[in-house]
Amino acid sequence: MTATASQELYEEIEGAYAYFNEVLFDGQLPGCLFTLQRKSNTFGYYSESRFLRRNGEGKSDEIALNPAYFAHRRVEQTLSTLAHEQVHQWQAHFGKRSRSGYHNAEWANKMQSIGLMPSDTGEPGGKRHGQQMTHYIIEGGPFDLSSKELIEQGRMLSWIDVVTKRVPMSAVLLYGPGGEPVPGTPEDPTIDISALTSAGLLQPDPGKEDPKNKRKYTCPSCHLNLWGKPGLSGRIQCIECAVPFMDS
Protein backbone atom coordinates (compact mmCIF):
# COMPACT_ATOMS: atom_id res chain seq x y z
CA MET A 1 0.00 0.00 0.00
CA THR A 2 1.30 3.44 -0.94
CA ALA A 3 2.03 5.65 2.05
CA THR A 4 -0.21 8.66 2.52
CA ALA A 5 1.21 12.18 2.49
CA SER A 6 0.80 12.32 6.26
CA GLN A 7 2.61 9.03 6.80
CA GLU A 8 5.41 10.03 4.45
CA LEU A 9 6.11 13.43 6.02
CA TYR A 10 5.82 12.27 9.62
CA GLU A 11 8.06 9.27 8.96
CA GLU A 12 10.67 11.65 7.53
CA ILE A 13 10.49 13.92 10.59
CA GLU A 14 10.54 10.94 12.95
CA GLY A 15 13.52 9.50 11.11
CA ALA A 16 15.41 12.80 11.29
CA TYR A 17 14.72 13.07 15.02
CA ALA A 18 15.97 9.52 15.64
CA TYR A 19 19.05 10.12 13.50
CA PHE A 20 20.04 13.33 15.28
CA ASN A 21 19.27 11.71 18.62
CA GLU A 22 21.88 9.06 17.89
CA VAL A 23 24.62 11.17 16.29
CA LEU A 24 24.23 14.43 18.24
CA PHE A 25 22.70 13.40 21.58
CA ASP A 26 24.12 9.89 22.14
CA GLY A 27 20.60 8.42 22.08
CA GLN A 28 19.61 10.19 25.31
CA LEU A 29 16.35 11.77 24.15
CA PRO A 30 13.13 9.92 25.05
CA GLY A 31 11.18 10.55 21.85
CA CYS A 32 8.24 12.88 21.40
CA LEU A 33 5.00 13.56 19.56
CA PHE A 34 5.43 15.72 16.45
CA THR A 35 2.93 18.32 15.30
CA LEU A 36 2.79 20.84 12.46
CA GLN A 37 1.74 24.25 13.77
CA ARG A 38 1.44 27.57 11.92
CA LYS A 39 2.35 29.62 14.98
CA SER A 40 3.20 33.21 14.07
CA ASN A 41 6.87 34.23 13.79
CA THR A 42 8.40 30.95 14.86
CA PHE A 43 10.00 28.06 12.99
CA GLY A 44 9.09 25.58 15.75
CA TYR A 45 8.82 25.01 19.49
CA TYR A 46 9.25 22.41 22.22
CA SER A 47 6.71 21.68 24.98
CA GLU A 48 7.50 19.25 27.79
CA SER A 49 4.91 16.57 28.72
CA ARG A 50 2.32 18.21 26.46
CA PHE A 51 0.46 14.98 25.68
CA LEU A 52 -0.97 12.36 28.03
CA ARG A 53 -2.18 8.92 26.95
CA ARG A 54 -5.95 8.79 27.36
CA ASN A 55 -5.78 5.91 29.87
CA GLY A 56 -3.18 7.78 31.91
CA GLU A 57 -0.39 5.31 31.14
CA GLY A 58 2.33 7.49 29.69
CA LYS A 59 2.99 11.02 28.57
CA SER A 60 4.95 12.62 25.75
CA ASP A 61 6.79 15.83 24.97
CA GLU A 62 5.83 17.78 21.85
CA ILE A 63 8.05 19.20 19.13
CA ALA A 64 6.22 21.38 16.62
CA LEU A 65 7.50 22.54 13.23
CA ASN A 66 5.94 25.37 11.24
CA PRO A 67 5.20 24.12 7.69
CA ALA A 68 4.51 27.65 6.45
CA TYR A 69 8.28 28.17 6.19
CA PHE A 70 9.23 24.84 4.58
CA ALA A 71 9.31 26.14 0.99
CA HIS A 72 11.44 29.21 1.68
CA ARG A 73 14.13 27.52 3.76
CA ARG A 74 16.62 24.89 2.67
CA VAL A 75 15.97 21.44 4.09
CA GLU A 76 19.00 21.62 6.40
CA GLN A 77 17.69 24.89 7.84
CA THR A 78 14.36 23.32 8.77
CA LEU A 79 16.26 20.33 10.17
CA SER A 80 18.34 22.76 12.24
CA THR A 81 15.07 23.94 13.82
CA LEU A 82 14.32 20.32 14.74
CA ALA A 83 17.78 19.96 16.32
CA HIS A 84 17.32 23.32 18.11
CA GLU A 85 14.14 21.98 19.73
CA GLN A 86 15.90 18.72 20.57
CA VAL A 87 18.40 20.78 22.58
CA HIS A 88 15.46 22.22 24.53
CA GLN A 89 14.25 18.67 25.15
CA TRP A 90 17.72 17.56 26.25
CA GLN A 91 17.88 20.43 28.74
CA ALA A 92 14.38 19.70 30.06
CA HIS A 93 15.37 16.11 30.88
CA PHE A 94 19.06 16.36 31.73
CA GLY A 95 19.92 20.00 32.42
CA LYS A 96 18.84 23.00 34.45
CA ARG A 97 16.36 25.31 32.81
CA SER A 98 15.95 28.99 33.59
CA ARG A 99 12.70 30.94 33.75
CA SER A 100 10.12 30.31 31.05
CA GLY A 101 11.30 31.29 27.59
CA TYR A 102 14.84 32.22 28.66
CA HIS A 103 17.73 30.55 26.84
CA ASN A 104 20.57 30.22 29.36
CA ALA A 105 24.29 29.50 29.05
CA GLU A 106 23.81 25.74 29.46
CA TRP A 107 21.44 25.69 26.50
CA ALA A 108 23.85 27.86 24.47
CA ASN A 109 26.79 25.55 25.22
CA LYS A 110 24.80 22.48 24.18
CA MET A 111 23.70 24.18 20.97
CA GLN A 112 27.29 25.03 20.09
CA SER A 113 28.46 21.50 20.92
CA ILE A 114 26.16 20.03 18.25
CA GLY A 115 27.18 22.62 15.65
CA LEU A 116 24.49 25.28 15.98
CA MET A 117 25.73 28.69 17.12
CA PRO A 118 23.14 30.48 19.28
CA SER A 119 22.61 34.12 18.34
CA ASP A 120 19.80 36.56 19.04
CA THR A 121 20.29 37.98 15.53
CA GLY A 122 20.92 34.72 13.69
CA GLU A 123 24.33 36.06 12.68
CA PRO A 124 27.86 36.16 14.14
CA GLY A 125 28.29 38.63 16.98
CA GLY A 126 24.79 38.19 18.41
CA LYS A 127 24.12 37.37 22.05
CA ARG A 128 24.49 33.66 22.91
CA HIS A 129 21.68 33.59 25.45
CA GLY A 130 18.56 35.59 26.20
CA GLN A 131 14.78 35.60 25.86
CA GLN A 132 14.38 35.61 22.08
CA MET A 133 17.00 33.40 20.44
CA THR A 134 17.73 31.78 17.10
CA HIS A 135 20.93 30.27 15.66
CA TYR A 136 23.07 29.73 12.60
CA ILE A 137 24.69 26.57 11.26
CA ILE A 138 28.44 26.23 11.82
CA GLU A 139 30.16 25.00 8.66
CA GLY A 140 31.90 21.68 9.23
CA GLY A 141 30.28 21.26 12.65
CA PRO A 142 28.50 18.09 13.83
CA PHE A 143 25.07 19.26 12.67
CA ASP A 144 26.30 20.49 9.29
CA LEU A 145 27.98 17.16 8.53
CA SER A 146 25.22 14.93 9.91
CA SER A 147 22.39 16.83 8.19
CA LYS A 148 24.16 16.56 4.82
CA GLU A 149 24.61 12.83 5.35
CA LEU A 150 20.95 12.45 6.30
CA ILE A 151 19.73 14.35 3.23
CA GLU A 152 21.98 12.26 0.98
CA GLN A 153 20.31 9.10 2.29
CA GLY A 154 17.01 9.93 0.61
CA ARG A 155 13.94 12.15 0.61
CA MET A 156 13.47 14.57 3.47
CA LEU A 157 10.59 17.01 4.06
CA SER A 158 9.19 16.01 0.70
CA TRP A 159 5.85 17.77 1.32
CA ILE A 160 5.69 21.57 1.56
CA ASP A 161 2.88 23.93 2.55
CA VAL A 162 1.49 25.70 -0.54
CA VAL A 163 0.57 28.79 1.51
CA THR A 164 4.07 29.86 2.43
CA LYS A 165 5.70 32.62 4.43
CA ARG A 166 8.90 34.49 3.76
CA VAL A 167 11.51 33.83 6.43
CA PRO A 168 11.08 36.55 9.11
CA MET A 169 14.32 35.80 10.94
CA SER A 170 18.01 35.78 10.10
CA ALA A 171 18.79 32.11 10.68
CA VAL A 172 19.02 31.33 6.98
CA LEU A 173 22.76 31.47 6.31
CA LEU A 174 25.68 29.14 6.83
CA TYR A 175 28.72 30.48 8.66
CA GLY A 176 32.23 29.13 9.11
CA PRO A 177 33.83 28.49 12.52
CA GLY A 178 35.27 32.01 12.50
CA GLY A 179 31.92 33.62 11.75
CA GLU A 180 32.57 34.26 8.06
CA PRO A 181 29.56 33.79 5.72
CA VAL A 182 29.70 30.71 3.49
CA PRO A 183 28.14 31.17 0.03
CA GLY A 184 24.97 29.20 -0.49
CA THR A 185 21.75 29.17 -2.45
CA PRO A 186 18.94 31.23 -0.92
CA GLU A 187 16.32 28.55 -1.50
CA ASP A 188 16.28 24.77 -1.68
CA PRO A 189 17.22 23.87 -5.29
CA THR A 190 14.88 20.86 -5.14
CA ILE A 191 11.85 23.17 -4.78
CA ASP A 192 10.78 25.03 -7.91
CA ILE A 193 9.23 28.13 -6.35
CA SER A 194 8.60 29.76 -9.75
CA ALA A 195 6.76 26.73 -11.09
CA LEU A 196 4.62 26.39 -7.98
CA THR A 197 3.79 30.09 -8.07
CA SER A 198 2.84 29.97 -11.76
CA ALA A 199 0.60 27.00 -11.05
CA GLY A 200 -1.20 29.00 -8.39
CA LEU A 201 0.04 26.74 -5.61
CA LEU A 202 2.17 29.42 -3.94
CA GLN A 203 1.41 33.00 -3.10
CA PRO A 204 3.67 35.29 -5.18
CA ASP A 205 6.36 37.26 -3.39
CA PRO A 206 4.65 40.50 -2.31
CA GLY A 207 7.93 42.33 -2.92
CA LYS A 208 7.75 41.68 -6.67
CA GLU A 209 5.13 43.40 -8.79
CA ASP A 210 3.66 41.95 -11.94
CA PRO A 211 4.84 44.28 -14.74
CA LYS A 212 1.43 43.81 -16.39
CA ASN A 213 -0.26 45.61 -13.48
CA LYS A 214 -0.67 49.32 -14.15
CA ARG A 215 0.15 51.90 -11.48
CA LYS A 216 -1.25 55.39 -10.98
CA TYR A 217 1.18 58.33 -11.05
CA THR A 218 0.39 61.93 -10.12
CA CYS A 219 2.08 65.25 -10.81
CA PRO A 220 2.62 66.79 -7.34
CA SER A 221 2.16 70.29 -8.80
CA CYS A 222 -0.94 70.21 -11.03
CA HIS A 223 -2.24 66.81 -9.83
CA LEU A 224 -2.56 65.43 -13.33
CA ASN A 225 -2.85 61.63 -13.24
CA LEU A 226 -1.57 58.98 -15.62
CA TRP A 227 -1.28 55.20 -15.53
CA GLY A 228 1.69 53.07 -16.53
CA LYS A 229 3.80 50.05 -15.66
CA PRO A 230 5.41 49.75 -12.17
CA GLY A 231 8.70 51.54 -11.58
CA LEU A 232 8.04 54.81 -13.41
CA SER A 233 7.85 57.01 -10.30
CA GLY A 234 10.36 59.86 -10.65
CA ARG A 235 11.33 58.75 -14.16
CA ILE A 236 8.64 60.49 -16.21
CA GLN A 237 8.00 64.24 -16.20
CA CYS A 238 4.94 66.49 -16.41
CA ILE A 239 5.46 68.70 -19.49
CA GLU A 240 3.43 71.60 -18.08
CA CYS A 241 5.09 71.71 -14.64
CA ALA A 242 8.53 70.26 -15.44
CA VAL A 243 8.41 68.03 -12.33
CA PRO A 244 8.45 64.22 -12.18
CA PHE A 245 5.30 62.19 -11.69
CA MET A 246 5.20 60.25 -8.40
CA ASP A 247 3.38 57.18 -7.11
CA SER A 248 -0.08 58.03 -5.83
Range-by-range predicted roles:
Residues S80-H93:
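Active-site recognition of the HExxH zinc-binding catalytic motif
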